[in-house]
Amino acid sequence: MNIALLSVGTELLLGDTINTNLSSLGQTLYSNGFILSSEVTVPDKKEIIKTEFLKLLKNNDVIITCGGIGPTEDDFTKEVICDALDLDLNLDEEHLSWMQSRWEARGLSMPETNIKQAQMPEGSKKLNNTQGTAPGVLLNHSDKYIFILPGPPREFKPLIIDEVVPLLKENFSTTKKNYDFVLFFNQAESSLAEEIDKFKPKGLDLAYLASKGIIKLRYDKNSISEDKLKEFLNDLNDNFSDSILSYENIPASRALFNLLKEKKLTLSIVESITGGNLSSEIVNYPGASSVLVAANTLYSNEAKKEFLASDISDDWEVLSQQLAEKSITKHNSSISLSILGEAGPVPSSNYKIGEIFIAISNNEKTVNFHHKLRGSRSDIIDRSVNNAVWDLINFIK
């Protein structure tokens, strides 16, 4: 069974809007036993929408469209699909009345342009949009299911969960794939794949996903026997125990948070280059107050001087150590971490862009780490956070 997504919107192709509907749809389908087969993004141009829709209709059992069913002149997805399938577009008087009452309740008159949202393709079923005024649409055409859904994510996702997934479960069998992950740090993707190929069992479905210093190894637990899978995971641990971040598909900061809770440790942080990004990730997790004692963002030299109550060193390895040791004393945490660095794109120090200095202290010892990272300013900042997390995990272990 093939499922395709047709995303409509020039703003998606221009990069003005990120297509979060694609990722949320893929995740929701997979968690319910289905796989999104393909996705096509098209501009707000009728002929292109029609052409790509008909291509998808030919090769898929289910087509989901998002976008182009609003009240403006560039919203014409329903119109185009009706043209492609030779269907009439009829006014749903009941829905129109409901829309008008919504406007009246706010003391406003509904613009005439909104009437098009109440138009429904001939023979279609209206899907209740609990977050907006444009209803979703379900068409059954030649035993193929066509869902025409709104583009705003807060409207799209509930319709997928409440309307699309239940219908798919009623009419199609779920996939037998069962993915799980192993997360690696400080590994080159090609080298990692080459080494794993030496002991990978025949038939094991693997994929490598690299991002910001972390490589996710995705594997299908159902593609080989349980015994062979267990042997494979043991081999992974034997060969890469020093590089494995997690056996779960979780953010690196979550792995750190879990470890701190497990060990009943508290943490204080001093951030410069990362500007509070590391502590921000940690506080996203419920129960963060039991782990994170304090976080100081010290961006300027003046702020660092004030924190230390002394002059600061031009040597960032020394300075990072001073900041970490001051933090653990000041905040009485089990562990402290400080991170300094040069993010660029124009150097603001004598250090090269991408040079990162991390210090971790636990009252008994302080350990320094020096990393040389590449990429844009945002890449370096993100990778700095991940390196700090990785260094801290290894310090604790």
PLM features: residue spans?
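Glycine-rich phosphate/diphosphate-binding loop of Rossmann-like nucleotide-binding domains
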Residues: 1-39
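Short alpha-helical segments enriched in small residues
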Residues: 46, 226-397
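Flexible gly/pro-rich beta->alpha loop and the following alpha-helix that scaffold active-site loops
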Residues: 66-91, 236, 240-247
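Short beta-strand elements in bilobed, periplasmic/extracellular small-molecule ligand-binding domains
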Residues: 29-42, 290-294, 367
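Conserved hydrophobic helix-helix packing surfaces used for dimerization/oligomerization
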Residues: 3-5, 146, 267
